[in-house]
A protein has these predicted regions:
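Short hydrophobic alpha-helices and adjacent helix-cap/hinge residues
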Residues: 1-245
Length: 245
């Protein structure tokens, strides 16, 4: 089973942090993971309070906000009947969960949804060419860690192709993206270092409860909205945690 975004903390032969691609990477080496999916539902740990084994970490549930992102997109662009989701096929657990939630939300909202795949810069470029051909009126970008590193590229492409897009982290909005809903980066990543430090001091991952990101923020870029010809409803702007002008 591939993990959405884990960190493996290895104490021998010397401390180092690497990115494992599967839970089977080790059953003894302490692993600190970070992921957007529910670690219990995907079988990563038996419970939040008692993770057991050699695993602990942080769950931000950003993958489970995919439907909320589509709802936000629909609220901003109610005339768009064709929309798309962009997921990373190399993270199948995350991609499948987001695809399932987006499809359910699209049915509820009466939208036609196309799910596109990308895991390289070139594939992202190709995806936007496809979006243009599909005449998609909006895009929800998946909560995969790879897309975090491509926030600027994604924001530039959404403006170039004039496609309203919603993502998980504020960095996308600060780079020119239209909006974001998700856990804050600080709330998500800071505990990872804390866990690593505690494990280095001798504590066992099995005894460290999995933490859940507690703060979800909504950001909107009003400058981008204006460039895309979108009028942000006052109730929506009032709900936003931050407006970029």
């Amino acid at each position: 089973m591939r993990l959405p975004s884990p960190l493996l903390f290895r104490t021998r032969p010397k401390p180092r942090i690497v990115i494992p691609r599967a839970q089977a990477a080790s059953t003894t080496v302490p692993i600190v993971f970070y992921g957007g999916a529910d670690p219990v539902s995907i079988g990563l740990v038996p419970s939040f309070s008692r993770p057991g084994g050699n695993l602990t970490g942080v769950a931000n549930f950003n993958a489970e906000l995919a439907a909320k992102r589509l709802e936000l997109l629909h609220e901003l662009v109610p005339t768009a009947t064709i929309v798309a989701g962009l997921v990373n096929p190399t993270s199948p657990v995350l991609a499948e969960a987001e695809t399932r939630d987006l499809q359910a939300a699209a049915r509820t909202l009466g939208l036609t949804l196309h799910v596109l795949h990308a895991c390289t810069e070139q594939e992202i470029d190709t995806a936007f060419t496809t979006l243009d051909q599909l005449r998609a009126g909006g895009l929800v970008i998946g909560a995969d860690p790879y897309f975090n590193s491509r926030s600027e590229q994604l924001a530039v492409l959404t403006l170039r192709y004039a496609i309203p897009a919603i993502y998980q982290f504020r960095e996308f909005v600060l780079s020119g993206g239209l909006g974001s809903i998700g856990a804050t980066v600080a709330d998500t990543y800071r505990p990872l270092g804390v866990f690593a430090g505690r494990i280095l001091k001798g504590e066992k991952p099995a005894d460290l409860p999995v933490q859940q990101a507690t703060k979800v923020e909504l950001l909107l870029n009003l400058k981008t909205a204006k460039a895309l010809g979108i009028t942000v409803p006052l109730p929506l702007s009032g709900r936003a945690d931050e407006l970029i002008e």
